[in-house]
Amino acid sequence: MRKLTFFLSICAAAVGSASAQKRNITEKDLFDFVWVGDPQISPDGSRVVFVRVTVNEKKEGYNTSLWSVPTAGGEEPHQLTKGDHDGQPRWSPDGKFIAFVRANEKDGKPEPPQLSILPMSGGDSFAFTDLPKGAADPKWSPDGKTIAFTSSNNPEDLAKQEKKKQKEEELKKAVTASSSPSPSPSKSGATAKATADPVKITAEALVKKAEAEAEHESDIQVITHAVYREDNDGYLDAKHPQHIWTVTAPKNADEKVQPKQLTSGRFDEGNVVWSKDGARIYYTSRHTDEPYYELAKTEIYAVAATGGESTKINTLELDAQDLSLSPDGKQLAFLGAVTQPVNSYTQPDLWIVDLAPNAKPRNLTEKFDSDLGAGVFGDNAPPRADGGNVPIWSQDGKSLIEIYGKEGRTILASFDVATGNATDLTHGNQAVGRFRTSADGSTIVYTVSTATRISDLFALPANGGEPKQLTNSNDKLFSQLNLTEPEEISYQSFDGKKIQAWVQKPPNFDAAKKYPLILNIHGGPHAAYGYIFEHEFQWMAAKGYVVLYPNPRGSTTYGQDFGNVIQYHYPGDDFKDLMAGVDELIKRGYIDNNKLGVTGGSGGGLLTNWVIGQTPRFAAAVAQRDIASWSDWWYSADFTLFQASWFKAPPFEDEADFKARSPITYIKNVKTPTMFILGEVDYRTPPGAGGEQMFRALKFRKIPTAMVRFPNESHELSRSGQPWHRVERLQHIVGWFDKWLMGAAKPEYDVAPQDEVPAKKDSAAKTPPNE
């Protein structure tokens, strides 16, 4: 017995030692994160190809490459491609090739992506398009002979490219001639040099001539549309709409193929789907020059795979996305939201429509009060090449697989085509991301994230059984970290409405102690927190903060009414939901009421500004990509509110409503030291309508404030910005809270940093005379 006790003591000591060796997560661990995206299962169901995303060596961007793993598990994933920017892998119907897109780098920046093919029998991949604007979204024809894709090239681009190639060929020949040896070796060196010089001069002259003849391209823009730029994409180019192209699938690098443009016109096209017999291609478009004056609608077209005029099949009075062809080729499934009544938020549903002229679509999930095709979000989805989902038909056409959001979780489910009834395929506190099935429907592969795991790949038998984990992308790193599971709580708001929230506590949390609190508010406003990895929250907790992240009214995953209840009242009662959550934690006894912080991004930035204008209880705030003035935002955002979704009228017709709901209106009430995090190319919430206003007003009022600006960063800074910028963002947020909640010295946020403090009054320095 004594020996057993001694043995158990040794084991306990070993476990304790292993635990002690773990460290807290840091902001810079992001540099070592690995993301898994866009899984594609082989036709025979034996393997999955996926995109592996990592931070590049300079920590200024991301590398993406294709990897493969068997669906049966038991093997480590292995790398298929070695490009820095490979993505969108798509298996050929016979499983012998993978088409994908690759963007090569020039001068440190990715060029337009081109279509490439990887032979699965062995050998290197090869590119087979060379289009000025690149190519994307490859789709194999059913017979595997042709690939459809989208591109925004126009005839002018192609003509310029051809002209440039001809010039380069002329220069190449001239340079080759100039470097050739003298044909008369018997001549003296001086004479030989004189003989070669005219050729060299000719080459230089050709270069200068080409430069002189290069057409000047104006860089001004004449804008006639209300929507003229998009966040993360920049200013829109009406001369380059996205169209449908096809190209013969080459079998090797020596086979030269010529892409063919199938559609044309001034409107974008997408959602490409091949007909079952490969004779036609279906796609969606909207032939309206200024769609913001109307409610959303989607037009479905068909074009012959050999080319010709497109035929409009249907006009759907909703915004349809993610088309999927039924096994018999007679129906399309898609996701879409109704447009009437005009809501602030309308849940997407799963629809089916016959491929017959003007057929009426059927809402499969009309009575299913959840968000189809969406769920919870975090800060660590793959920052590049994540891919997307489409509803997947069962082989017999009797069911469809899709994800939905429910109370902080994202669930994969099967929906009965006849009844709309749902059967959950995944369970537990997690968020399903991307999913695919094998051709026979027997195997489902999908990505999953949890509160302590960045997405990994899993395989699940469609007829039931336990999921099998195929990748362990971050296990080596995470095994070294003290990550804590958040506590799910619920509380009643002022009107009795139940609010769900999560509490991220520090490692080795002690309920007898008092901790500073950070209230973290999500954006959207129609979005949801939940069981998904949040690097930001884990790091805040590791730094000694308790983090509260609630889903106030207006959040998704709680039904249509809960999501839309804030229409024309945002901000409003959602603020009360947030304060009720803070009160709930304070009642639990482990929060220091004098050390309350608040932060949030986008809609969360708006609410952060709102909070500090409504209550002085917070000792520090960080508003990120925020809104200060609804009126200024109405005029400058990258999308319009011409429809009465968030406001009943424009600001010049209802100034009082815009003013009443704008945080800047209440700036005179603010006492909280506040930082503003801004992306300089954020077109979703432009800095001039948000943080710049708040910062200037607080400076006038002599309230401590700082503005942190991130060059070349859009609204997506926190999720897909440059890695260094993402890390610096976290450092500044926590740094500000450290200063005001922890009492840390942060001279970088002082008007006069310590090394530039003016001399004391009793010093020998004197004020220089006026000159």
Model-found features: residue ranges?
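Serine-hydrolase catalytic core recognition
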Residues: 326, 431-771
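Predominantly five- to eight-bladed beta-propeller fold
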Residues: 63-64, 152-253, 284, 294-301, ...
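Short loop/turn segments that connect beta-strands within beta-propeller blades
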Residues: 70-74, 119-123, 249-253, 304-308, ...
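Short, solvent-exposed loop/turn segments at conserved positions within beta-propeller repeat blades
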Residues: 58-64, 106-113, 236-241, 291-298, ...
